[in-house]
């Protein structure tokens, strides 16, 4: 039949149609030749199929196979007149294009989800939550998390993933450090913060500027108070030496008040109940009226030992003497203090009272019947002045030791 239709040559081979695009509207016959071993013995055969009309003007191809070409069993020849090639599909093995196959493509897709961006986010969250951490700590936690999530991975693949995770964590830390989100000092990693916009950054800088200016003011107040203390102490020492030279003898023991001390001032009509401990280091006062507490520095200022620097009423002669009582590096500060009133002295002693503080009896009713004071030579004293300069601590200690020795002798 094929020979009568002109499809077979005289030598028995199939004739190839060369000019098939004469009329795109005509139906085209496609022939598929299959190896005899693949033909069903029950009599089912592959018959030529006639395709419908095609509206696309594309050259139609005829898929031809020869009976002499070997073909494996369970293999289908897939061809189409619209495709220029033919390929064989096996029925025993699933196609690699299946999204459910556990091949390289699927595993590669899983690893693509653990890229640098993914690990940067994870590392950023870890460091932000901890505040201060290290590379090993972050890497170990992430390895533990991903290893627990991927239990089906083989041991050799798990080791590879752990190395990959640690490398990604290292890269992510470098990226975050380059963006100034974290800082690294030796092995310690600290969280700085996420980048902000210009307006917010400007606002944060302004807040930081105000905070630092406030700290500078506090430090200036501390420095001024320390300068006043040094001037008052040195001026007192010079006055005592001058008095001893004039009297040609030391002052009587009962007329000496050792530093530090406090003075309690109240009305003559106030009833005072005073209790003293056995070691004479603690005194308990009960007042039925208002009273004032003054520390030693306040008393020295009222005596004029600060040369008027605390009130800005320093004369040229007092300024010259005050400048001679301080180190040369502090002389400009003394000049500035003399030009204006020193105000807002910053007090750092915990539980202290300001100079010349006034109390009332009602202020002492919250869980206490009175006030507790310490002896002038006691170490438990807490006054409002800043710490005594170092150059005078030794003298005070020596005087206190002598005083204690005299008490023991008595």
UniProtKB/Swiss-Prot annotation:
GO molecular function, one term: DNA-binding transcription factor binding
Region listing for Enhances binding of RB protein to E2F, in residue ranges: 211-327
Biased composition (Acidic residues): 394-410
GO CC annotation, single: cytoplasm
Main location: nucleus
Region described as DCB2: spans on this chain: 259-315
Coiled coil: none
Region Interaction with CEBPA, annotated ranges: 105-127
DNA-binding region(s) in UniProt: 113-195
Domain of life assignment: Eukaryota
Positions carrying Phosphoserine: 23
Region (DCB1): 214-246
Induction: Down-regulated during differentiation.
Modified residues (N6-acetyllysine): 3
Annotated region (Dimerization), positions in chain: 204-277
Localization of this protein: Nucleus; Cytoplasm
InterPro entries (UniProt xref): E2F-DP_heterodim, E2F_WHTH_DNA-bd_dom, TF_DP_C_sf, Transc_factor_DP_C, Transcrpt_fac_DP, WH-like_DNA-bd_sf, WH_DNA-bd_sf
Biased composition (Polar residues): 73-100, 373-385
Region described as Disordered: 73-116, 370-410
Cross-referenced Pfam families: DP, E2F_TDP
Compositional bias annotation for Basic residues: 104-116
Family to which this protein belongs: Belongs to the E2F/DP family.
Record's function text: Can stimulate E2F-dependent transcription. Binds DNA cooperatively with E2F family members through the E2 recognition site, 5'-TTTC[CG]CGC-3', found in the promoter region of a number of genes whose products are involved in cell cycle regulation or in DNA replication. The E2F1:DP complex appears to mediate both cell proliferation and apoptosis. Blocks adipocyte differentiation by repressing CEBPA binding to its target gene promoters.
Protein name: Transcription factor Dp-1
Organism: Homo sapiens
């Amino acid at each position: 039949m094929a020979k009568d239709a002109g499809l077979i040559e005289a030598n028995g081979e199939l004739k190839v149609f060369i000019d098939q695009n004469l009329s795109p509207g005509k139906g085209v016959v496609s022939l598929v030749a299959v190896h005899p071993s693949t033909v069903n013995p029950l009599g089912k055969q592959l018959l030529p199929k006639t395709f419908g009309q095609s509206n696309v003007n594309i050259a139609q191809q005829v898929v031809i196979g020869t009976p002499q070409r070997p073909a494996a069993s369970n293999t289908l020849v897939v061809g189409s007149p619209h495709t220029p090639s033919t390929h064989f599909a096996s029925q025993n093995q699933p196609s690699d294009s299946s999204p459910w196959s556990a091949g390289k493509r699927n595993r590669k897709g899983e690893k693509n989800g653990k890229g640098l961006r993914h690990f940067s986010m994870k590392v950023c969250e870890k460091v932000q939550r901890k505040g201060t951490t290290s590379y090993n700590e972050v890497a170990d936690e992430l390895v533990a998390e991903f290893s627990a999530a991927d239990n089906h991975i083989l041991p050799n693949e798990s080791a590879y993933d752990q190395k990959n995770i640690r490398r990604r964590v290292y890269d992510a830390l470098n990226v975050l450090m380059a963006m100034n989100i974290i800082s690294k000092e030796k092995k310690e990693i600290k969280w700085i913060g996420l980048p902000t916009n210009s307006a917010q950054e400007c606002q944060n800088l302004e807040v930081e500027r105000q905070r630092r200016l406030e700290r500078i003011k506090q430090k200036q107040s501390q420095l001024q108070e320390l300068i006043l203390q040094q001037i008052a102490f040195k001026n007192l020492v010079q006055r005592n030496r001058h008095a001893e030279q004039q009297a040609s003898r030391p002052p009587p023991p009962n007329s000496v008040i050792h530093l530090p001390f406090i003075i309690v001032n109240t009305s003559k009509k106030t009833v005072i109940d005073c209790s003293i401990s056995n070691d004479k280091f603690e005194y308990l006062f009960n007042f039925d009226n208002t009273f004032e507490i003054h520390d030693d520095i306040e008393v020295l200022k009222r005596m004029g030992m600060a040369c008027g620097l605390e009130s800005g009423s320093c004369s040229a002669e007092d300024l010259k003497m005050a400048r001679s009582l301080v180190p040369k590096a502090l002389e400009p500060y003394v000049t500035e203090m003399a030009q204006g009133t020193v105000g807002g002295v910053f007090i750092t002693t915990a539980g202290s009272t300001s100079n010349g503080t006034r109390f009332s009896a009602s202020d002492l009713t919250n869980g206490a019947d009175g006030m507790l004071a310490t002896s002038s030579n006691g170490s438990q004293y807490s006054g409002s002045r800043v710490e005594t300069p170092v150059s005078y601590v030794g003298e005070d200690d020596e005087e206190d030791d002598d005083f204690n020795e005299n008490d023991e002798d008595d």
